[in-house]
């Protein structure tokens, strides 16, 4: 691997309540987010042969408050409204998502426990953190899409992308970029370095809340992040998004320019939030979740709850999700191999 990441000692005293797509920490369980339930509460007629026999655990490889967690809670809220079934979010963050992944892989394949997240299981495998990828699971449907994470800088230090690149070229290997080995953003940062022709000092700054703390205190120069976690800092004039590895800009992230539009040829996979079940889960169980996710996303209130985050409603069947996972795995593997 290009370099070993060194832990960054965080000294800032402010406390923030955010979390990223991945993170580190202990497992916690929490109920679905509150709020008005669908008007069809408990009244959805499911045609599947199988149905949950009790409370369903949605295992999230991240702490509470980030994009993965909030979209999982949105599903839990509206799925309960449709079916009357309790869905609880279990935050099991740590070790680049492998804590949550292993928890699900060791669970019974009875449909009562599943992993919810994006391509983190693939990145952890490519980085050598785990010896399995998406193929160790039975894929379920996909519920939402978050555009690929943008790269953010402290507005007091850098005005825009050009200012950051100039500073990085003037001090090779000295500007600090936050990521975590095996995290979704790890290869994103490495690919950005290559595309921009710069050399950064990669540091493990912990979870998204830790990264934000380090950014605000001036301990790091660059951090990746989901737009929903950084939006308030952009609006406050504290952060500048220097770009995101989009094929083209998204309407849902109006303050995030595509690197391609700024002259940097750099595209990276989006975060597509899918359901991962233990191996050999019965097709009847998968059919139930295919149908349920489709019904949830037909609800205008559920759609609005996602776009208000802001995250995009995005439905794929289990079969389509498996094909999408294969594409994402191969894409990130190619990026990793090109950087070796």
Model-derived features with residue positions:
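Short, low-complexity disordered leader/linker segments with a strong preference
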Residues: 1-57, 337-340
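N-terminal (or domain-start) structured segment
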Residues: 34-135, 185, 198-221, 233, ...
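Hinge/capping helix and adjacent helix->loop/strand transition within the periplasmic-binding protein
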Residues: 53-54, 106-111, 126-210, 259, ...
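Ligand-binding "clamshell"
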Residues: 109-110, 126-139, 198-199, 233-244, ...
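Ligand-binding pocket segment of bilobal, Venus flytrap-like solute-binding proteins
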Residues: 174, 179-181, 185-256
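C-terminal lobe and pocket-closing loops
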Residues: 230-298, 323, 327-330
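Mature extracytoplasmic/periplasmic domains
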Residues: 294, 298, 302-323
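Extracellular/periplasmic bilobal clamshell ligand-binding domains
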Residues: 317-340
């Amino acid at each position: 691997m290009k370099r070993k990441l060194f832990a960054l000692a965080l000294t800032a005293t402010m406390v923030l309540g955010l979390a990223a797509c991945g993170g580190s920490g202990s497992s916690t369980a929490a109920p679905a987010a509150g709020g008005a339930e669908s008007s069809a509460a408990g009244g959805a007629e499911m045609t599947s042969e199988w149905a949950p026999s009790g409370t369903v655990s949605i295992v999230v490889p991240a702490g509470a408050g980030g994009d993965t967690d909030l979209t999982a809670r949105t599903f839990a809220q509206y799925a309960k409204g449709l079916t009357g079934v309790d869905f609880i979010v279990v935050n099991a963050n740590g070790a680049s998502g492998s804590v949550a992944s292993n928890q699900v892989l060791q669970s019974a394949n009875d449909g009562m426990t599943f992993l919810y997240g994006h391509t983190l299981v693939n990145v952890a495998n490519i980085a050598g953190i785990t010896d399995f990828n998406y193929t160790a699971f039975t894929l379920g449907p996909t519920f939402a899409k978050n555009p690929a994470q943008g790269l953010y800088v402290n507005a007091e230090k850098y005005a825009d992308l050009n200012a950051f690149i100039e500073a990085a070229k003037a001090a090779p290997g000295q500007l600090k970029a936050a990521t975590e080995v095996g995290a979704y953003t790890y290869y994103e940062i490495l690919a950005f370095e290559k595309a921009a022709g710069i050399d950064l000092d990669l540091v493990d700054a912990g979870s998204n809340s830790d990264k934000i703390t380090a950014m605000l205190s001036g301990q790091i120069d660059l951090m990746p992040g989901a737009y929903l976690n950084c939006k308030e800092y952009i609006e406050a004039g504290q952060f500048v998004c220097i770009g995101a590895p989009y094929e083209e800009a998204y309407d849902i992230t109006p303050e995030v320019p595509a690197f391609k539009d700024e002259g940097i040829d750099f595209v990276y996979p989006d975060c597509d939030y899918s359901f991962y079940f233990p191996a050999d889960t019965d097709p009847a169980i998968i059919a139930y979740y295919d149908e349920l996710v489709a019904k949830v996303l037909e609800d205008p209130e559920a759609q609005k709850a996602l776009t208000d985050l802001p995250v995009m409603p995005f439905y794929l069947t289990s079969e389509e999700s498996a094909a999408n996972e294969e594409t994402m795995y191969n894409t990130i593997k190619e990026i990793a191999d090109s950087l070796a």
